UniProtKB/Swiss-Prot annotation:
The lineage of its organism: Archaea, Thermoproteota, Thermoprotei, Thermoproteales, Thermoproteaceae. It is an enzyme of class 2 (transferase). HAMAP family: RNApol_arch_Rpo3. Part of the RNA polymerase complex. It comes from Pyrobaculum neutrophilum (strain DSM 2338 / JCM 9278 / NBRC 100436 / V24Sta) (Thermoproteus neutrophilus). Belongs to the archaeal Rpo3/eukaryotic RPB3 RNA polymerase subunit family. It is found in: Cytoplasm. It catalyses: RNA(n) + a ribonucleoside 5'-triphosphate = RNA(n+1) + diphosphate. This is DNA-directed RNA polymerase subunit Rpo3. DNA-dependent RNA polymerase (RNAP) catalyzes the transcription of DNA into RNA using the four ribonucleoside triphosphates as substrates. The gene is rpo3.
Length: 262
């Protein structure tokens, strides 16, 4: 039975020691987190007026990279949005941006006006473009649910892991030699497996480095679209659904093969 011990936690970051799981399972979770989690991002921009020095295409690109809060609990499942089962209007949010400069002014992400108060820029102070007196920007932007496998602007979080190192210091002089790489050689949470291996290259046979089988240090960092608890909950839901679809496909394949033999 896999076991998890949380060693560091904030609303947007989590580090834990995972034990008793196969690498394939841990890596599957990592890949779902970095490429499958749904988030809102601006995907379509209708420029009504743009007299700034920035091209419309670059302006739209910048808008798309602004992270938006994404209340998954009040949105349809991403699968329904992708398949068309959900009303498209429930999977999109309209923004407007209208700025007329009376002097030098910087347009920030906070100037975007959303039709939904729960879908807004995560950070209000992301600069979009600078305007001088007489310039203006008027546009409509539409954000939709998407996944990072389609474009990086839909990436909700990063995740990674390393094998839990097991370090044996055979000569105390090695600690000082490796201090710039690892302050505490025997602390797996500070000295990653790769760092320990770097120290082994420095110390030779004075340091032995191994790893514990099926034990890892796993961490997740959210970009702020939602907290890390929501990210993990959604990642497990997606992973569980993938396994169910895979088993169903296997069952159908097996059934078809059996019928063919008859």
């Amino acid at each position: 039975m896999p076991a998890v011990k949380v060693v560091e936690r904030t609303p947007l970051f989590l580090k834990a020691v995972v034990e008793g799981a196969y690498p394939s399972l841990v890596n599957s979770l990592r890949r779902v987190i970095i490429s499958e989690l749904p988030v809102m991002a601006i995907d379509t921009v209708i420029v009504v007026n743009n007299t700034s020095v920035m091209y419309d295409e670059m302006l739209a690109h910048r808008l798309g990279l602004i992270p938006l809060t994404t209340p998954l609990q009040s949105l349809p499942p991403i699968e329904d949005c992708e398949s068309g089962l959900a009303d498209p209007s429930e999977c999109t949010v309209r923004f407007t941006l209208q700025v007329n400069a009376d002097g030098e002014v910087t347009v920030y992400s906070g100037d975007l006006v959303s039709e939904r108060p729960d879908v807004v820029p995560v950070h209000k102070d992301i600069p979009i473009v600078k305007l001088v007196k007489g310039q203006s920007i008027v546009l409509e932007a539409y954000a939709k649910l998407g996944r990072a496998r389609g474009h990086a602007k839909w990436q909700a979080a990063l995740a990674s892991y390393y094998y839990y190192p097991r370090v044996e210091v055979r000569d105390e002089s090695c600690r000082e030699r490796c201090r710039e790489v690892c302050r505490d050689l025997t602390n797996p949470l500070e000295c990653t497996f790769n760092k320990a291996m770097t120290c082994r290259d420095l110390c030779g046979d004075k340091l032995h480095v191994d790893w514990e089988r099926n034990k890892y240090v796993f961490w997740v960092e959210s970009f702020g679209n939602y907290d890390v608890d929501t990210a993990l909950r959604e990642a497990f839901r997606i992973l569980k659904r993938k396994y169910s679809l895979f088993l169903d496909a296997l069952a159908r394949k097996s059934s078809s093969a059996a019928e063919a033999k008859l």
